[in-house]
Amino acid sequence: MLVAVEIFGFFLTAVGLLMLGVTLAHSSWRVSTVHGNVITTNTIFENLWYSCATDSMGVHNCWEFPSMLALSGYIQACRALMITAILLGFLGLFLGMVGLRCTNIGGLELSRKTKLAATAGALHILAGICGMVAVSWYAFNITRDFFNPLYAGTKYELGPALYLGWSACLLAILGGICLFSNCCCSRDRDPATGVQLPYKAPVIPAASLAARLPAAASDEEGDSSFGKYGKNAYV
């Protein structure tokens, strides 16, 4: 059962990481459509790197943002968060591959594999949180400008990349929780069957036990020698 949970969590994190990469490269983070009397005359869509426009004739033009310093602060922060999420996801994917019980990469012991799997789960949870913050922050700015009556610029709507990003972050977090919680649940279980192991009393080494016996014997002798003399012996 524990092995199945680990494999399921690893699969979720791998799919989540792939979807995060697609989200970062997706062109439609926000979309604006200009409608004419009969047909759609112009469609503008942007992501974190460039802006594109498509007219009614199907002509497609894209241009990159001129300078990183000229961008809004939240776009720069979203870039950093998404790149951090993908790097954490790749590191977690590698550690998870090594830490799975069903793999024999590196020939590690079970205890080390469990720790690596837990570390991989924590990294995937952090990656999902970073991606979730980036996507949600970007969506917040879109909705704020859209419903602001004083905003004179182009009003955009949420693009499909944001929904893809939310799904990717959710998969990464769920997979990371499976890997991390599986480490906590496997401490007192049989690694092969997943059955709860019976309680074992702590074993006291023979050397420490022998060191304790003379001290206890001397205490008993002192008590017995003191007991030989009662109150009447001093009268």
From Swiss-Prot:
Residues 25-74, 141-159 are extracellular. Palmitoylated. The record marks D55, E64 as: Important for Na(+)-selective paracellular ion transport. It is a multi-pass membrane protein. It comes from Bos taurus. Pfam families: PMP22_Claudin. The gene is CLDN15. Residues 1, 100-115, 183-235 are cytoplasmic. The chain crosses the membrane at residues 2-24, 75-99, 116-140, 160-182. This is Claudin-15. GO terms for cellular component: bicellular tight junction; plasma membrane; tight junction. It is found in: Cell junction, Tight junction; Cell membrane. PANTHER family: CLAUDIN. Belongs to the claudin family. The keyword Transmembrane applies. Disulfide bonds join C52-C62. The keyword Disulfide bond applies. The modification Phosphoserine is found at S111, S218, S225. The record marks M68 as: Important for the formation of tight-junction strand-like structures. Residues 146-147 are annotated as: Important for the formation of tight-junction strand-like structures.
